[in-house]
């Protein structure tokens, strides 16, 4: 008997199984196809706005995704470099096949982890507690806990034009049947969501004299804090083009055969990743939409047509593609399609990702209504950590909104109405100046170490880095930069300092002043500073912390206020009916979501500040 069974080996399942095994639990990972683990069923990329931050957080906690993309990436870019550091987001194109092969090797090398090719079609529950899983082969396997990471496989239905086929991820992969019904019988409620993917085309059929080349960054930072430099790594270009008025006219001729407009698709699709037909229908004033041509690997001719997600008939798809500049002779290898699938509203899970209806049963990934590889991987990681800790009778690890984007993600899931596929944005995080990609290790290594996923040496390195930041900051506050040196460093039109010089910490708040420039101008100063730390990553942290010092102090004060509400626990059996003074809507929402803390309750739409005040009085605070 295993401690933990993980059903599904996508991005959530892989991280869940690795986290469980690395934290000391025996784990079995079950997949319908073990050659397709961590498959990138949609875009061949990791990271991007907010998603890059999540990927680095996964790494800081001891997960695998960042290492995988560093090893298999084919193009690396830092997005939003023209904006402040809170908005900088790493993104990488992946070699889709190599990524799966890398993750398969990692899974097979893990000591406490076994793999099984089969399909989970049901669960057994005894006395409100998880007991075992039922397999398609007829076997029943017992375990202490289970994590369901089913992706889009639950009663999956694929749509291409007016045709539809049962499919879990592609037409070639069958859906999972029986598991939804088993969960409903155990007390869960389910609904349908929809997502889609663009066609893939043969990159040899693209006219590269017309499309715009997009190269990767020359010296990109790695995703993983443990990877070392990836500068000099071979990269491959992406390409940019756009739809035309003719494209839109062609696609409109297929609207009468679109499952989206005919009502065949009942599931709600992702608001922020609409299909091309939806974009044309909703934004009639737009003459064109950007199309990004993204290679799927070094050793394949398949190209992903980002921005052209569609479920229109195949003849309309190919005609539309061939109306796009640079794609007049394009050959379509695989058509785009939409897929409907079952999910379970995340109001049915706790912050630990354990379900409320069945003890020791956890949900992670698209089963909770999210979209995106990174969001799924983050949930899998936390579910694996917390399932393992639950079996050891240890408290769950809860990341707060001020700790990580992962904390924002999980908090949003358990407090908001998730009626469409949820994806993370930087705007979702009110503390995004604190939650930067560059400081994920400083924020989260302690949690990974507590969970048993970050070893002692790595944790000591992080503590040493943090100490160097503190000592370097103190040094810069104590050292005065001579006025003449500052004059030479500042642009002529800038405000000149008063006589007497300026502390180095204050000078670094001026535009254009960096530690490297100060080091170049003042060799003795540089020598003294480098005795404290010669680590450029330490220098980067010091510069950011000083430049945004006032803003960071305000954010930290705000997090302290929120922390007081987070410390007030609401028992799961709390009797809201007995609390006089609650609004009727507030009581209804509190009964539906059953928040675990007063802070969580305060973020539920429909729960007013006066409702929170009433609860504080009831709790005796």
From Swiss-Prot:
A molecular function GO annotation: flavin adenine dinucleotide binding
Gene3D superfamilies from the UniProt entry: FAD/NAD(P)-binding domain (3.50.50.60), GidA associated domain, C-terminal subdomain (1.10.150.570), tRNA uridine 5-carboxymethylaminomethyl modification enzyme MnmG/GidA (1.10.10.1800)
Annotated Gene Ontology cellular component terms: cytosol
Subcellular location, record wording: Cytoplasm
Binding site for FAD: 8-13
Keyword Ribosomal protein part of the UniProt annotation: no
Residues engaged in binding NAD(+): 269-283
Main location, first listed in the record: cytoplasm
GO annotation terms (biological process): tRNA methylation; tRNA wobble uridine modification
Cofactor field: FAD
Keyword annotations from UniProtKB, A to Z: Cytoplasm, FAD, Flavoprotein, NAD, tRNA processing
SUPFAM superfamilies: FAD/NAD(P)-binding domain
Subunit structure: Homodimer. Heterotetramer of two MnmE and two MnmG subunits.
Family: Belongs to the MnmG family.
Function statement: NAD-binding protein involved in the addition of a carboxymethylaminomethyl (cmnm) group at the wobble position (U34) of certain tRNAs, forming tRNA-cmnm(5)s(2)U34.
This protein's name: tRNA uridine 5-carboxymethylaminomethyl modification enzyme MnmG
Species this protein is from: Chlorobium phaeovibrioides (strain DSM 265 / 1930) (Prosthecochloris vibrioformis (strain DSM 265))
Encoding gene, per UniProt annotation: mnmG
């Amino acid at each position: 008997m295993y401690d933990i069974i993980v059903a599904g080996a996508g991005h959530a399942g892989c991280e869940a199984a690795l986290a469980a095994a690395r934290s000391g639990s025996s784990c079995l990972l079950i997949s319908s196809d073990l050659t397709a683990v961590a498959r990138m069923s949609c875009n061949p990329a990791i990271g991007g706005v907010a998603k890059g931050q999540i990927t680095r957080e996964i790494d800081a906690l001891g997960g695998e995704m960042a290492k995988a993309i560093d090893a298999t990436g084919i193009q690396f870019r830092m997005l939003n470099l023209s904006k402040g550091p809170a908005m900088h987001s790493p993104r990488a194109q992946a070699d889709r096949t190599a990524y799966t092969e890398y993750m398969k090797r990692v899974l097979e090398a893990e000591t406490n982890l076994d793999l099984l090719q089969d399909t989970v079609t049901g669960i057994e529950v005894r006395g409100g507690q998880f007991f075992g899983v039922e397999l398609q082969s007829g076997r029943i396997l017992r375990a202490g806990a289970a994590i369901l990471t089913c992706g889009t496989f639950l009663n999956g239905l694929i749509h291409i034009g007016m045709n539809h086929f049962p499919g879990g991820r592609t037409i070639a992969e069958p859906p999972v049947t029986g598991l939804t019904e088993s969960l409903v019988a155990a007390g869960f409620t389910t609904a349908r969501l929809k997502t889609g993917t663009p066609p893939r085309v043969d990159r040899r059929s693209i006219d590269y004299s017309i499309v715009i080349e997009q190269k990767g960054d020359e010296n990109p930072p790695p995703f993983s804090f443990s990877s070392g430099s990836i500068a000099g790594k071979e990269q491959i270009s992406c390409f940019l083009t756009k739809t035309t008025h003719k494209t839109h006219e062609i696609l409109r001729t297929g609207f009468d055969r679109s499952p989206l407009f005919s009502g065949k698709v009942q599931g709600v699709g992702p608001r922020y990743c609409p299909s091309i037909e939806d974009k044309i229908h909703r934004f009639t004033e737009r003459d064109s939409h950007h199309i990004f041509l993204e290679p799927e690997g070094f050793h394949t001719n398949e190209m992903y047509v980002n921005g052209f997600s569609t479920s229109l008939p195949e003849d309309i798809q190919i005609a539309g593609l061939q109306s796009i500049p640079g794609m007049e002779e394009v050959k379509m290898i695989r058509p785009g399609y939409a897929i409907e699938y079952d999910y379970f509203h995340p109001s049915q899970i706790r912050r630990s990702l354990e379900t409320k209806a069945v003890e020791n049963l956890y949900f992670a990934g698209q089963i909770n209504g999210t979209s995106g590889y990174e969001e799924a991987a983050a949930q899998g990681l936390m579910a694996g950590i917390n399932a393992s800790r639950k079996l050891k009778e240890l408290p769950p690890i809860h990341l707060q909104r001020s700790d990580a984007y992962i904390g924002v993600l999980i908090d949003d899931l358990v407090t908001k109405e998730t009626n469409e596929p949820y994806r993370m944005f930087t705007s979702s995080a009110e503390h995004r100046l604190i939650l930067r990609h560059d400081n994920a290790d400083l924020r989260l290594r302690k949690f990974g170490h507590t969970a048993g996923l970050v070893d002692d040496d790595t944790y000591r390195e992080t503590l040493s880095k943090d100490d160097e930041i503190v000592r370097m900051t103190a040094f810069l506050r104590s050292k005065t930069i001579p006025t003449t040196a500052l004059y030479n460093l500042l642009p002529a039109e800038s405000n000149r300092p008063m006589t007497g010089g300026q502390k180095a910490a204050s000078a670094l708040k001026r535009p254009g002043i960096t530690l490297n420039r100060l080091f170049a101008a003042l060799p003795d100063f540089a020598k003294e500073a480098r005795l404290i730390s010669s680590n450029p990553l330490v220098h980067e942290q010091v510069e950011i912390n000083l430049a945004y010092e006032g803003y960071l102090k305000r954010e930290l004060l705000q997090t302290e206020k929120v922390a007081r509400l987070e410390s007030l626990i609401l028992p799961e059996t709390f009797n809201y009916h007995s609390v006089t003074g609650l609004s009727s809507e507030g009581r209804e929402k509190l009964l539906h979501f059953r928040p675990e803390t007063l802070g969580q309750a305060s973020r539920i739409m429909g729960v007013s500040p006066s409702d929170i005040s009433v609860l504080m009085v009831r709790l005796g605070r």
